[in-house]
Structures are given as C-alpha cells and as structure tokens.
C-alpha cells in the first residue's frame, strides 16, 4: 500500500500545497519563497527518506511567520493522512544529530496526542531571517496537525544555522523511524487497540 497524501490550504495570507510519500527515497521539490526554509525542508525530506513536494506563497513581505506556520499545518496534515489508521507502524522514533558544533535530539510518539517540547537555546539571529522562534512555530504546527508528541532538545550550538539544521535533520530521522512499518506489529501499537 502506498502511504502518500496531498493536502492544500488557502487563506487570506497564504496558499500552501504539500504532497508527501512516506516510503520514498528523499526526492524533493520545494518552493516557499523563503530560501533558508526551502533548504531546511529539502534536507528534512532527504534525511527522512520522504518524497516531498511543497509549493507555498504568502505574505512574506510582512514576515515569514504565516507561511512557515501554514506549511507546518499542511505538512502535518499530509503526514497524518498518509499514516492512515497507523496500523503496523513502529510509532516511536528518536535521533541524535550533529551539525558541526550543534547537537540536536528529537523523540517522536505518533500517538494522536499532539504536544511539543522545544528546548532549544535562543541564539542571535543569522542573516537568513529564519530564527529559532520561527522553527519552533513550524514544529508546533507540524506536531499538532500530525497528531504527534514531539520532543526537541539542543544540547549546545553557537551558529543559528547549524542549530536549526541539526533540529530539522534529527526530526526527519526520528520521523522516518516512527513511520516505519514493522511486520511484528499487526495492528496499532497500543494496548488500547487504537492510536
């Protein structure tokens, strides 16, 4: 069974379309109007082995917030839809990923209980205009709309680009693990009988 989904969202502020294939090879076509965000989403797809298409336009002349948050909403909805009833998935995933001097941890439970813990130090903003707070808004929207509990922690890092990149890579690798199918799991991985 092909685990893929396409979701669109249009508001007065943004227009977003996402297609995701969970069992992909990491191919990506990303266009958000925000170069650094494009880079983060591209490496998210590559390191998670998701085939991902994101087309987004928004009021980035105001700021990046609306576009980044809405991409998180639509990506979360897309992954949630692609997971279906979540039968047979490993459900849990984790990764520790370095990027030069930065080290990020990500732990995921695809529990249908949305929650974000984001323990990432504030770092002076880089020239990209895409800071740690914006990354937090993306992951909050993503976690809530995917129905996942997501814990993110950065132990250390000085360069904001490296910190944010290590986070995106860690989440991608953890999500790849959590969405992976396991032949030993015949239904939802829960004593309740559902996730």
UniProtKB/Swiss-Prot annotation:
Provide the E.C. number(s) assigned to this enzyme: 4.2.1.19
Q: Which InterPro entries match?
A: IGPD_sf, ImidazoleglycerolP_deHydtase, ImidazoleglycerP_deHydtase_CS, Ribosomal_Su5_D2-typ_SF
**Pathway the protein acts in:** Amino-acid biosynthesis; L-histidine biosynthesis; L-histidine from 5-phospho-alpha-D-ribose 1-diphosphate: step 6/9
What are the GO BP annotations of this UniProt entry?
Answer: L-histidine biosynthetic process
Which Gene3D superfamilies does the annotation name?
Imidazole glycerol phosphate dehydratase, domain 1 (3.30.230.40)
Its family? Belongs to the imidazoleglycerol-phosphate dehydratase family.
Q: Tell me where on the tree of life, at the top rank, the source sits.
A: Bacteria
Which keywords are on file for this protein? Amino-acid biosynthesis, Cytoplasm, Histidine biosynthesis, Lyase
A single cellular component GO annotation: cytoplasm
Which GO molecular function, any one, fits this protein according to its record? imidazoleglycerol-phosphate dehydratase activity
This protein's name: Imidazoleglycerol-phosphate dehydratase
Q: Where in the cell is it found?
A: Cytoplasm
Report which reactions are catalysed by this protein.
Answer: D-erythro-1-(imidazol-4-yl)glycerol 3-phosphate = 3-(imidazol-4-yl)-2-oxopropyl phosphate + H2O
